Amino acid sequence: MSPTLVVDQENSEEFNTSSFEGPEKLLELWFSAPIKTNLSAGEKANLGLKAVSRNDWDDMLAQAQCKVLSVVNSEEIDAYLLSESSMFVFAHKIILKTCGTTTLLASLPRLLEIASSVGFDRPLRIFYSRKNFLYPERQLAPHTSWEEEVRYLQLFFPSGCSYVVGPTNKNHWHLFSDLADDYSLLEDSLDPEDETLEVLMTDMSPERSLQFYAPSLDVVRSARGDDYVREKNNLSGGHILGSYVADESGVRDLCSTSDKKAVLDAFQFEPIGFSSNMIYKDRYATIHVTPQEHCSYASFETNVSQFQFGRSISETIEKTVKTFGANKFCLTLFQAKGASQEKHFSAKLKSFSSYKREEFIVYDFPGYDLIFASFTAV
């Protein structure tokens, strides 16, 4: 099945223009073993979460205080570009990522109810994580503090564990994780090459930040011609500008796979701010940018492997921070224990050009290793 794009014109022009909380809240729930793809035409399969209606997702997202801008669908993934970040729905797994003062965890009861409606009793694995907030005093319940978030999560997952990774007076990262007693049902089917990279960047260079201030459609027409705009007449203005900004800023190149078959859905907010989702088979990448000088932030997350990108993890990280001109960044890398990991990866993390490594921490989780590292430009 070829990926398809559905644009929600009604929700496509909203944006908060003042100081903005870029760092996202990220929730990931795994419900069961992956359901097979490449089904024969007449075969009826349990699509799991992918069978959930758009109305149900809209209802859930309303609890988190965000809306859908557009959706890219493929056989393996439904990728939702949101007014505040992104959501990725697989048959057995959901990833919800929201920024600003959204109340992501307030959507958890509805999310679990929706999962139950398609046959999932409870998650086999849960991750909730976020970087330290820029404006913690502006957050709404249940996000007014990490302690409050943990208390709320433990109402649903009482055996979950809380971690604060990195120095609390500098860039650091919070994680809540839980495993069901029968997690082994899922562990046997894990992809041995599974890896998820997050690069969380602050203090962007002014030159790079300006790329994510919305140009006018007249500027796009002048640069690319009327045909460029005309061929995208099924898109909203924000999506037309998003496609142009993705090209000009290097975002499209950053998200391109080695076979050039990835599909990108990008949106440029007016007057400022940028979001994009990319899907490739059962893989994704997502980028979100808050370019204001006093609160600049950009994030890049992907589970596309180094083999599919055609470059090493270290090269992807270097390309990412160069694209956004970050003066500070931290990263997290979850890798399956069976992955063909880059040799001497920890040593390579010392040698990014123009950056000093401040922290390097490794956690050993069931089935996965977690690496956290933070860097400052020198």
UniProtKB/Swiss-Prot annotation:
Cofactor: pyruvate
Keyword S-adenosyl-L-methionine listed: yes
Top-level lineage group: Eukaryota
Reactions that this protein is recorded to catalyse: S-adenosyl-L-methionine + H(+) = S-adenosyl 3-(methylsulfanyl)propylamine + CO2
GO MF terms held by the record: adenosylmethionine decarboxylase activity
Pathway annotation from the record: Amine and polyamine biosynthesis; S-adenosylmethioninamine biosynthesis; S-adenosylmethioninamine from S-adenosyl-L-methionine: step 1/1
The keyword DNA repair belongs to this UniProt entry's keyword annotation: no
Catalytic center residues: E21, E24, S85, C99, S275, H288
EC identifiers of the protein: 4.1.1.50
An example Gene Ontology biological process: spermidine biosynthetic process
Pfam families: SAM_decarbox
GO cellular-component term (any): nucleus
Family: Belongs to the eukaryotic AdoMetDC family.
Protein name: S-adenosylmethionine decarboxylase proenzyme
Source organism per UniProt: Schizosaccharomyces pombe (strain 972 / ATCC 24843) (Fission yeast)
